Amino acid sequence: MAKRDYYDVLGVSKGASPDEIKKGFRKKAKELHPDRNSDNPNAEAQFKEANEAYDILKDPDKKAAYDRYGHAAFENGSGGPRGPGGFGGQGQGDFASAFSDVFEDLFGDFMGGQRGGGRQRAARGSDLRYNLRITLEQAFMGMQKTISVPGTVSCSACEGTGAEGGAEPVVCPTCSGMGKVRAQQGFFTIEKTCPTCSGMGQIIKNPCQACRGAGREEKTRALSVNIPAGVETGTRIRLAGEGDAGVRGGPSGDLYIFIEVEEHRIFQREGLDLYCRVPVSMTSAALGGDVEVPTIEGGRSRVKIPSGSQSGRQMRLRGKGMPALRGAGTGDMFIELAVETPVNLTMRQRELLREFEAESQDNQPETSKFFKTVKSFWDGMKS
């Protein structure tokens, strides 16, 4: 019985793209899978036929041979592309192989692990993380910082190829560049990573002496990083392409800089706002006055203290906080008063305070209010 055209089997045209071929296969595989067609005696044969067609059309080399020679390209004894490891011809079209292939394409890594990964000649380098501690002043101003980052770079001797003299790798003779081989174990066909090329699909005949064929080498690089004004602890800065070098010419990873702003000895930060706790004397709080306070940019501001101020009272200096990270405004600075009780009093100071207390019974509303509340509480307990 003559074989059907592989394109007709998958329901696609001869000019179909790889994605269209894959979609056609997935559709047919779902329709024809034996588990869903227990009442159709032809389902298994049609299922294997679809898998056989996809096995040819998904591979550019096999597809080119099929487009040129048709089914004859894969018949035994022909000059068709029959690669080592059982990839060339239709003898592998048994149900076990078909079952494996359909689950590879329908469910990816769940059943197939890293199948087909050997065809990827290049791989992206790893991302790197760098923790950077800066002061609050540096976070306020922004800065240009030079950091030393250990990692891997493309080997300068072989230009990342891994081969001596920068020569290009050659196709692995064991798997013909597929990165995987198949072995028959009873009813099942087992697919595994090619032991010769470790799944890369290529081998290096003369490894580079400097990097021993890795194509990369360890190196600590000095990088200049722009820290924008307004960063805070947890801010992440991404430097694209500054991570580890890629494998076999693949793109480099990225470098992520995580900012940690040190605690300040004067200011506490909450978002864009700054808080500064300023001690004032008891007389300044009672009589009023003014106090000079520092600002984060290194300047000074005078703040008026209203008479009768209590501990915890806050006064705002607008626009004296931290800048927003992307220039959207500036926070404020809050001055919190801490009224200081005098210590180590002289006899004269004690006498004056006692005289003051005797004269100030009507000048302490909060104290009077508190003790009236306490007296009312006690009276209520007695009744």
From Swiss-Prot:
Main subcellular localisation: cytoplasm
Cofactor note: Binds 2 Zn(2+) ions per monomer.
CXXCXGXG motif repeat locations: 155-162, 172-179, 194-201, 208-215
ZnF segments: CR-type: 142-220
SMART domains found in the cross-reference section: DnaJ
Gene Ontology biological process terms from the UniProt entry: chaperone cofactor-dependent protein refolding; DNA replication; protein refolding; response to heat
Keywords: Chaperone, Cytoplasm, DNA replication, Metal-binding, Repeat, Stress response, Zinc, Zinc-finger
J domain segment(s): 5-70
InterPro entries assigned: DnaJ, DnaJ_C, DnaJ_domain, DnaJ_domain_CS, HSP40/DnaJ_pept-bd, HSP_DnaJ_Cys-rich_dom, HSP_DnaJ_Cys-rich_dom_sf, J_dom_sf
Binding site for Zn(2+) 2: C172, C175, C194, C197
List of residues binding Zn(2+) 1: C155, C158, C208, C211
Subcellular location: Cytoplasm
Assigned GO CC terms: cytoplasm
Cofactor names: Zn(2+)
Superkingdom field: Bacteria
Gene Ontology terms, MF aspect: ATP binding; heat shock protein binding; unfolded protein binding; zinc ion binding
Family note: Belongs to the DnaJ family.
NCBIfam families given in the database record: DnaJ_bact, PRK10767.1
Domain notes: The J domain is necessary and sufficient to stimulate DnaK ATPase activity. Zinc center 1 plays an important role in the autonomous, DnaK-independent chaperone activity of DnaJ. Zinc center 2 is essential for interaction with DnaK and for DnaJ activity.
UniProt cross-references to HAMAP family, sorted A to Z: DnaJ
Role according to the record: Participates actively in the response to hyperosmotic and heat shock by preventing the aggregation of stress-denatured proteins and by disaggregating proteins, also in an autonomous, DnaK-independent fashion. Unfolded proteins bind initially to DnaJ; upon interaction with the DnaJ-bound protein, DnaK hydrolyzes its bound ATP, resulting in the formation of a stable complex. GrpE releases ADP from DnaK; ATP binding to DnaK triggers the release of the substrate protein, thus completing the reaction cycle.
Subunit structure: Homodimer.
Name of the protein in question: Chaperone protein DnaJ
Organism this protein belongs to: Dinoroseobacter shibae (strain DSM 16493 / NCIMB 14021 / DFL 12)
